[in-house]
Amino acid sequence: MGGALLCLVCSLATAAVQPIRIGVPGAFTGGSAPMGLSMRNGIRLAAAEINRSGGLLGRPIELVERDDGGLPARGIKVAQQLLTQERVVAVVGFVNTGVALAASKNYQDARVPVMLAVATAAILTRQFPLHGNSDNFIFRVAAADDLQAPLIVREAVQRSAYRKLAIFADNTNYGYQGLMELERALGQHGLKPSYVARFNLQERDMANALLQARNAGSQAILTYAIGPELAELANTMARMDWKVPIIGSWTLSMSNFIDNAGPNGEGARMVQSYIPDEDDSGRRRDFLDGYQWLFHTRRIPSPPSAAQGYDGMKLLAEAIRQAGSLDGVAIVHALENLRQPVAGVITTYKQPFSRTDHEALELNVPVIGKVERGRVVYAYPADKLRQ
């Protein structure tokens, strides 16, 4: 009897400290790896801070990380793994739009909350319409494409007074969604693209498309692609001695654009949710110092990805605390009705979500960055002061 009782006590004690398993799917290899690895590190840093403070509901967080390589088919397999084998209670992650589009239904059907930390297609948080008592389990803490595109166009049309703008977008879902949003944003200014180019991943010949864009009188290039192909674009422009600005989505801040383009990437401008700065203080200084200490590096390959991953984990954690439960529906309802502000890197989140709006970032949050001497800095002093 005593042995049985001891076993029961041990079993209950073990159950009481079982970790809360959070899935972290993302591209940790391939061309999107700078985003994926930075995102993962941001999530790890947030989880480490939460665990140092006692965890959630008296239990530690355990991250279950899986590499989808930026491939939609692998993303579906990762989702199935995380749901059926790893039994995660929620997910923070997703780098590539195509992967998120392919895999998000698995989580929605399983009623497991997802915090998108990088993938930006506008449709992602709106693809599961609300009917009656149904819930949408997809949230985001990143600048969606329908938020970025108007800022890109505003930078080109209002700030720079360009009227002839070419669009270069890759042939992924990311590029397609971005192209649509850029065309829509140009249309709001009464403009159409001077030229549109689509190209494949690992494209190594952009000269013909750039020649046509130049012949169309394009004054600047608007981009929706990722680092390696963006570098090829900048390098080809340099070989052609065609000096027009590159203005694009946040991926122009990726390390594999800046490194591979070298001096040819100087001056490229992009939308950013977060720019590390030597004058940072408070929460931003703590985040940067913590990242550099924990991961033994002075450089973040994709700073917005790291900050968004960090903030996404913090928002999810606060929802779990408020819900007092690991039930997916309870976590969703808590996210939609957060009572306490959440101090993040990008901003302090005060009721960032509602039942009908699952986007944490609004139009007034992102800023414009530019590549200067191999790193991204604020393009405008006013943005630095505002952030």
Regions found by a protein language model. Name each.
Residues 15-387:
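Extracytosolic ligand-binding ectodomains
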Residues 2-11:
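Bacterial N-terminal signal peptides
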